[in-house]
UniProtKB/Swiss-Prot annotation:
Cofactor(s) for this UniProt protein: Ca(2+); chloride
Catalysed reactions, semicolon-separated: Endohydrolysis of (1->4)-alpha-D-glucosidic linkages in polysaccharides containing three or more (1->4)-alpha-linked D-glucose units
Protein name as it appears in the record: Alpha-amylase 1
Binding residue positions for chloride: 202, 304, 343
Pfam families (UniProt xref): Alpha-amylase (PF00128), Alpha-amylase_C (PF02806)
Active site feature: 204 (nucleophile), 241 (proton donor)
Quaternary context: Monomer.
Length: 494
């Protein structure tokens, strides 16, 4: 009997453990959130940029039909009308083609899935032509009726876990995930995406759903589609949106047994450090001692689509593309450090926090335009195409799983460390120059700094660093330089 129970427990553990595997193709790391991009444009980006530059995956905006709202704000994508795959980003055929094309070049697709709720009042018409009556909780495109929802009540007290999970988030009709029919429709939706070749999901508003109900849903998912290059038996990577800054009734620890979580404390803490509110020397023990979830349970980011707008967690300390020098430094630190699964934000520029993506006519999303230096125009920021960020994805791929060694700091805001003997990075966030002889851990030779430039044949378009036979190098980062970071690795040796 004990043996039988042990086997069952081990089987359940195996299922759970698989949800933390990113399913990345070998030798790749780093996910990018191509926020509000169209499917055809993402497919081309996988082939032309993400694949060649070593990115491992793309988080895409919600794929299912959403309510059409006046002035087309970004958040209409988070107001589901049905689970039909028709949005401003494209239809099911375009989505399926994108997933295939991205998988073919080693770039995985992760879908932002919204199944905590359906559209709020006023969301009567969808992007796929479906109609709904949110006031009577009728969504015939699924179909859902009032029987499938929790009673109407508003969330006003985040110290009441029952209210947070059973009431409505800003008027969004709250589905009852404990209802077997609701579970069935959600699983049907997710399994359809798995059939189409996705590698995993970001689960929106996970803290507003009961962990036990999510466990039933996740446990009902198919294995990933081997026709798309996934290993037999591979399970979807699940990252749950759980904002836990402490002091609330709901804790991320309730969810980390089911999958990874969005580690908002990482965003808050890295913002404080690179904004100068916390000295960089204290990053020496970056990780769980900062209150983060375990490394394989943490999706980490500098900013996300919510908190760059002041929504969610982090407030004024969150770094965004609007503070480019510090943003690039924080992104470089995240990508250089082994902690967590990093996600790079790729934004559109905005002045109004409700503003939707660039359009051609006020309705249809515009494609990004690309400049000769790889940057974007046409209202798209494309942080993932900034040299200081995409070259650090290359750094992360070059250093692999090598541990942090050779930590150095000046007792203030100048720090450096190596990743084993494969990579070295240094930062200067002080208001005076960094000029020091530092142990890099790297083999002797001349290296190209991948922040200021790129290796091109046997030359470098930026700074070079000469490492001596003892592994030391003279590191120089002026306080007035455009970039407060320098990075070298074995694949950038000249």
């Amino acid at each position: 009997m004990f043996l039988a129970k042990s086997i069952v427990c081990l089987a359940l553990l195996a299922v759970a453990n698989a949800q933390f595997n990113t399913n990345y193709a070998s030798g790749r790391s780093g996910m990018v959130h191509l926020f509000e991009w169209k499917w055809d444009d993402i497919a081309a980006e996988c082939e032309n940029f993400l694949g060649p530059y070593g990115y491992a995956g793309v988080q895409v905006s919600p794929v299912n039909e959403n309510a059409v709202k006046d002035s087309r704000p970004w958040w209409e994508r988070y107001q589901p009308i049905s689970y039909k795959l028709v949005t401003r980003s494209g239809n099911e055929e375009q989505f399926a083609s994108m997933v295939r094309r991205c998988n073919n070049v080693g770039v995985r697709i992760y879908v932002d899935v919204v199944f905590n709720h359906m559209a709020a009042n006023g969301g009567t018409y969808g992007t796929g032509g479906s109609t709904a009556s949110p006031s009577s909780k009728s969504y015939p495109g699924v179909p859902f009726s009032s029987l499938d929802f929790n009673p109407t009540c508003a969330i006003s007290n985040y110290n009441d876990a029952n209210q947070v999970r059973n009431c409505e988030l800003v008027g969004l009709r709250d589905l009852n995930q404990g209802n077997s029919y609701v579970q069935e429709k959600i699983v049907e939706f997710l399994n359809h995406l798995i059939d189409l070749g996705v590698a995993g999901f970001r689960v929106d508003a996970a803290k507003h759903m009961w962990p036990a109900d999510l466990g039933v849903i996740y446990g009902s998912l198919k294995n990933l589609n081997t026709d798309h290059g996934f290993e037999s038996g591979a399970k979807a990577y699940i990252v749950q949106e759980v904002i836990d800054m402490g002091g609330e009734a709901i804790s991320k620890s309730e969810y980390t047994g089911l999958g990874a979580i969005t580690e908002f404390r990482h965003s808050d803490s890295i913002g404080k450090a690179f904004r100068g509110k916390n000295q960089l020397q204290y990053l020496v023990n970056w990780g769980v001692s900062w209150g983060f979830a375990a490394s394989d349970r943490s999706l980490v980011f500098v900013d996300n689509h919510d908190n760059q707008r002041g929504h969610g967690a982090g407030g004024a300390d969150v770094l965004t593309y609007k503070v480019p020098k510090q943003y690039k430094m924080a992104s470089a630190f995240m990508l250089a450090h082994p902690f967590g699964t990093p996600r790079v934000m790729s934004s559109f520029s905005f002045t109004d926090t409700d503003q939707g993506p660039p359009t051609t006519d006020g309705q249809n999303i515009a494609s990004p335009s690309f400049n000769s230096d790889n940057s974007c125009s046409g209202g798209w920021v494309c942080e993932h195409r900034w040299k200081q960020i995409y070259n650090m994805v290359g750094f992360r791929n070059a250093v692999g799983s090598d541990a942090i060694q050779n930590w150095w700091d000046n007792g203030s805001n100048q720090i450096a460390f190596s990743r084993g003997s494969k990579g070295f990075v240094a930062f200067n966030n002080d208001n005076y120059d960094l000029n020091s002889s530092v142990q890099t851990g790297l083999p002797a030779g001349t290296y190209c700094d991948v922040i200021s430039g790129s290796k091109s044949g046997s030359s470098c378009t930026g700074k070079t660093v000469t490492v001596g036979s003892d592994g030391r190098a003279n590191i120089s980062i002026g306080s007035s330089e455009d970039d407060g970071v320098l990075a070298i690795h074995v694949n950038a040796k000249l």
